[in-house]
């Protein structure tokens, strides 16, 4: 390390006390030679990220395709993972070829034959060990999520914790894959229903939660007896490589067959192979509404199942009876967390006219305190958008809102200069708008918050529901009647409806998903496991007669 430092600093001699421990050399060097601090920063960042990649077994160029412990080597095209944090290339991943894809599906199909016969609690035990393995790698994996995707380090670590939590949930679930018993109208008969493993589950995940959404699907599917093929986002492929490397440790110890956990990489074409493949009974896809419609149509054409978790256009209603200070935290985090790139990010605030001015002033002042910068620095609240295409969409949305008559309360814009070299850092914007604006009806994956007023709760709920999407919603109120109306049949039409918390940050114990153009799918907790299984009704006759249902007579 010292030799590398000297080379990096053009042979500068290092004068260090022998008592200084090697791991402190960098820190001591920076302290002794403060003028060189700026020079050393890129070296230090490179060194730390190199260490993280080594821990996660990520090479400079990585194979695209794996069936568990084994990887398929090829010379296919490369996907370059570019960090939005600083614009650096982290590493590269090969793309999966059609021949490799077919080998993966064959391997998964063969593995399913034995995996489904393993008792569910034993599959749960393997998932428990995966949770423990994730605990060991929480720090480096969380840092990779933050660096490759751009979310804050706290959110990156939180995403890995979500993986651990779903493992814990799935372990308990493995002993509770319950059916039902029913009473038969025929004497001497017993009826019940049970659930069987479905088969191969194809998982297409998005960049904004590059590891958590995979785990929501995979851990449940595994305890249900399914095998999985995962295509991570081409914008965050290294997170997929890292997860496959982590779980391979557990699979090796437990002699899990190749094909239970498969990884493929590539762009739209690879996703289309999954969607059109009749060997894959279920496709779980997370992404834009446009993508979901294409996948839903492809899977539906072959009468397969699709679990779609698509866009959101989430609103918080701020009642005149709200605790405004508490509401402020939920609104600001919901709008700017992950730089507005959560499907549950808060896009709209529907504020009662009596508190509109007061709350808006609080909001504008809060936005002045937001720190934007390198997400690996825990002092910063907001990191970058994923890439320059996202930045362009953000800028276009602001201009569209202005063109429709929106009033900008907090100016947006792209940040430039030191620390913002990637060109992906933007300022969270706040705009007064109308719910009917075309741009407000559209989900923009960026930190743009639209404000609007209401007079009555009926009006507020109507505005909340009057968008094509139906994922998450919330009301801030201390009035029980208002909260109950919001949660009633005449209230929010979203899959998630909260009271006195924001729209983002769902816990894994509840089913996650939404209605309308959000896709209708449910993942994670509650009884979401049922989508990964096939339901079977059984009737058993334990008499010496064969009576027919509905009293039909058929004598021979």
PLM regions and their residue ranges:
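Hydrophobic face of amphipathic alpha-helices that form TPR/SEL1-like repeat modules
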Residues: 48-86
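Conserved C-terminal structural/oligomerization subdomain of aldehyde/semialdehyde dehydrogenase
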Residues: 86-91, 255-256, 280, 317, ...
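Residue-level signal for inorganic ion chemistry
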Residues: 87, 123, 145, 167, ...
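Short, well-ordered beta-strand elements within core beta-sheets of diverse protein domains
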Residues: 89-96, 111-117, 203, 316-319, ...
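Rossmann-like NAD(P) dinucleotide-binding subdomain of oxidoreductase/dehydrogenase enzymes
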Residues: 179-326, 454
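ALDH superfamily catalytic-core signature
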Residues: 246-249, 290-435, 457, 462, ...
């Amino acid at each position: 390390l010292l030799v590398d430092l000297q080379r990096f600093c053009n042979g500068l001699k290092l004068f260090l006390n022998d008592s200084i421990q090697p791991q402190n050399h960098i820190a001591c060097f920076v302290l002794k030679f403060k003028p060189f601090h700026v020079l050393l920063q890129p070296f230090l960042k490179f060194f730390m990220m190199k260490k993280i990649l080594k821990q996660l077994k990520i090479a400079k160029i990585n194979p695209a395709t794996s069936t568990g412990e084994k990887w398929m080597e090829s010379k296919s095209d490369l996907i370059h993972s570019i960090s939005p944090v600083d614009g650096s290339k982290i590493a590269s991943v090969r793309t999966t070829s059609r021949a490799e894809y077919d080998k993966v599906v064959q391997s998964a199909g063969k593995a399913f034959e034995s995996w489904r016969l393993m008792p569910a609690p034993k599959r749960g035990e393997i998932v428990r060990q995966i949770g423990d393995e994730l605990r060991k790698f929480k720090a480096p994996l969380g840092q990779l999520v933050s660096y490759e995707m751009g979310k804050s380090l706290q959110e990156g670590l939180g995403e890995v914790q979500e993986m651990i939590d779903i493992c814990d949930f799935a372990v308990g679930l493995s002993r509770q894959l319950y059916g039902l018993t029913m009473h038969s109208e025929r004497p001497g008969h017993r009826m019940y229903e049970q659930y069987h493993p479905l088969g191969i589950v194809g998982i297409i995940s998005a960049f904004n939660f590059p590891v958590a959404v995979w785990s929501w699907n995979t851990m449940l599917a595994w305890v249900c007896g399914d095998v999985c093929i995962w295509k991570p986002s081409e914008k965050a492929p290294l997170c997929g490589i890292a997860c496959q490397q982590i779980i391979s440790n557990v699979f090796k110890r437990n002699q899990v067959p190749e094909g239970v956990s498969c990884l493929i990489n590539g762009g739209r074409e690879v996703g289309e192979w999954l969607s059109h493949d009749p060997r894959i009974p279920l496709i779980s896809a997370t992404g834009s509404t446009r993508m979901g419609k294409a996948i839903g149509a492809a899977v539906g054409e072959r009468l397969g199942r699709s679990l779609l978790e698509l866009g959101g256009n989430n609103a918080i209603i701020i009642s005149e009876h709200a605790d405004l200070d508490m509401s402020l935290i939920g609104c600001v985090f919901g709008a700017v967390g992950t730089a507005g790139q959560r499907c549950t990010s808060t896009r709209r605030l529907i504020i009662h006219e009596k508190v509109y001015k007061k709350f808006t002033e609080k909001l504008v002042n809060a936005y002045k305190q937001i720190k934007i910068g390198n997400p690996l620095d825990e002092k910063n609240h907001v990191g970058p958008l994923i890439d320059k295409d996202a930045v362009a969409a953000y800028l276009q949305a602001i201009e569209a809102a202005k063109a429709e008559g929106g009033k900008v309360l907090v100016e947006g814009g792209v940040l430039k200069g030191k620390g913002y070299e990637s060109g992906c850092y933007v300022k969270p914007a706040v705009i007064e708008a109308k719910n009917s604006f075309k741009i407000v009806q559209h989900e923009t994956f960026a930190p743009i918050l639209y404000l609007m007023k209401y007079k009555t709760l009926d009006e507020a709920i109507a505005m909340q529901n009057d968008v094509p999407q139906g994922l998450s919603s919330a009301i801030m109120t201390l009035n029980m009647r208002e909260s109950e109306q919001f949660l009633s049949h005449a209230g929010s039409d979203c899959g998630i409806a909260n009271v006195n918390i924001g729209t983002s940050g769902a816990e894994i114990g509840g089913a996650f998903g939404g209605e309308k153009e959000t896709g209708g799918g449910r993942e994670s907790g509650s009884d979401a496991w049922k989508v990964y299984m096939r339901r079977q009704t059984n009737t058993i006759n334990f008499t010496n007669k064969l009576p027919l249902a509905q009293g039909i007579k058929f004598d021979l």
